[in-house]
């Protein structure tokens, strides 16, 4: 069963958190859920070059809080926070309420090459540039290994290299224990649009096992060849406070 179900949905409340954190009545729930979907689609479409890994949405009374995990926070923040104001206006326009209070927090992804969505996005970009899929997968695996992940699985489906018959190819490096609920599995999907049709991309990244309230176990000497990474940036929007 662990190989069929969505790894994120299976681990909600165990090693994964909900992407939308709010409660609503049965009457307003569908509208708010569709609103979240529109916000995410708007952000990924307009700021695709920012390498946005995840969008977390929370609601408190009339306030909307949006947290963006990105590989390039400077693209979102802009000069003196001008990008944040533009993003806030875009979200207000998307939800159809210019007076809605929107608070935006931008968090930098610590290990870009160890993030499943960013890896899937990289693979999609390479495939759209007509790079051979085997070479693309090999390069993605090497990048993930340098980031120190414990295991990785990549699957690509469609008309690979322009073949007449669609097929599925996959590769796995290290451990990817999909049946272990305490395993921290980062899962993402992406679609690559090519001249021969669309290619489906799935990426599973095993980051360690979570025991109780402990952080995921990181392999010893995960990245000894790389110098110490700089502290991840975080921009917290306080423009709506007091």
Swiss-Prot record:
Its domain of life?
Bacteria
- Annotated GO MF terms: mRNA binding; rRNA binding; structural constituent of ribosome
**Where is there biased composition of kind Basic and acidic residues?**
233-242
* Region ranges (Disordered): 221-242
Which Gene Ontology BP terms does the record give?
translation
What is known about what this protein does?
Answer: Binds the lower part of the 30S subunit head. Binds mRNA in the 70S ribosome, positioning it for translation.
Q: State the oligomer form and interacting partners.
A: Part of the 30S ribosomal subunit. Forms a tight complex with proteins S10 and S14.
Protein name per UniProt? Small ribosomal subunit protein uS3
User: Which gene name belongs to this protein?
Assistant: rpsC
């Amino acid at each position: 069963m662990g190989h069929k179900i969505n790894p994120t949905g299976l681990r909600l409340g165990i090693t994964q958190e909900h992407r939308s954190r709010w409660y609503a009545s049965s009457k307003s729930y569908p509208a708010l859920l569709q609103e979240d979907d529109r916000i995410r689609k708007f952000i990924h479409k307009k700021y695709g070059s920012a390498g946005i890994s995840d969008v977390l949405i929370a609601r408190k009374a009339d306030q909307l809080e949006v947290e963006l995990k990105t590989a390039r926070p400077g693209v979102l923040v802009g000069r003196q926070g001008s990008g944040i104001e533009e993003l806030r206006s875009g979200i207000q326009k998307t939800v159809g309420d210019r007076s809605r209070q929107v608070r935006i927090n931008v968090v930098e992804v610590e290990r870009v090459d160890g993030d499943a969505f960013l890896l899937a996005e990289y693979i999609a970009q390479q495939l759209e540039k007509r790079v051979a899929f085997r070479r693309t997968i090999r390069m993605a695996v090497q990048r993930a290994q340098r980031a120190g992940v414990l295991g990785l699985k990549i699957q690509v489906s469609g008309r690979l290299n322009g073949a007449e018959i669609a097929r599925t190819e996959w590769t796995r490096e290290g451990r990817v224990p999909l049946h272990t609920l305490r395993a921290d599995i980062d899962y993402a999907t992406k679609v690559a649009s090519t001249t021969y049709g669309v290619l489906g991309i799935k990426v599973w990244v095993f980051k360690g096992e979570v025991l109780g309230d402990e952080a995921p176990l990181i392999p010893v000497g995960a990245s000894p060849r790389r110098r110490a990474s700089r502290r991840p940036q975080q921009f917290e929007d306080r423009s709506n406070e007091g």
